[in-house]
Design a protein with these regions (language model features):
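Flexible, low-complexity segments enriched for small/polar residues
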Residues: 1-11, 17-205
Length: 205
């Protein structure tokens, strides 16, 4: 704290220089700083859009207003009424975001988001072509590619094995060889994304 205070005082109380010092410091990039806070609902929603390169179909009306409204609505359902904080300090929940109703809404959002397959329906969607960019001929490499795209997330070998097993299991519960096709991308890869977005590790920044 002291070294940042010195920058602030020494640079004529410049917020710009203070921010520069913080964002370029070793502490900012340390392992302790990564995945130390729970994503706020806005971070969860907007981050999910950006990390997978989602597109947006506004339906009827102004594109920007409809997109923003969807973000606000989803965030509010998760417990964060954007631009209407509980007090002047804003939200200081962190682990408080992890509650029964909030987590259920996160799971519901991730399912609805990744299930929206095309521009035919209003809302954010990820096309099969976009998902194909992260899909690999080997199931384990596919899992790791999506863990990287959605984070990068560090998960246990057991979690990787479980996600890999999901890709190699058909709807009847039988073990099958992993192949890359329009069908597997549309079904299994979308399911994989939903499972990753439901992981405890994905809830953290």
């Amino acid at each position: 704290i002291e070294k940042f205070a010195e920058v602030y005082l020494g640079k004529d109380h410049s917020i710009r220089e203070l921010a520069r010092a913080v964002f370029t410091s070793d502490e900012f990039f340390s392992q302790r700083a990564r995945f130390a806070l729970v994503k706020t609902p806005v971070e969860y929603v907007v981050g999910s859009y950006r990390m997978l390169g989602a597109q947006y179909n506004p339906g009827e009306g102004d594109r920007r207003n409809r997109r923003d409204q969807q973000t606000y609505t989803r965030s509010r359902l998760m417990g964060m009424d954007v631009f209407n904080p509980p007090d002047v300090n804003g939200w200081d929940l962190n682990i408080g975001w992890v509650n029964t109703s909030g987590m259920l809404e996160r799971f519901n959002f991730s399912n609805a988001y990744i299930s929206n397959r095309s521009a035919d329906a209003p809302g954010a969607f990820v096309s099969n072509d976009q998902l194909r960019k992260y899909t690999r001929p080997a199931s384990k490499k596919t899992v790791k590619k999506f863990l990287s795209a959605l984070g990068p997330l560090k998960v246990s070998s057991a979690t990787i094995k479980q996600l890999k097993g999901y890709l190699e299991t058909d709807d009847q519960g039988r073990t099958v060889a992993w192949t890359v096709s329009d069908q597997t991308i549309d079904q299994k890869v979308r399911g994989l994304v939903h499972q990753i977005m439901s992981l405890p590790e994905y809830q953290l920044n």
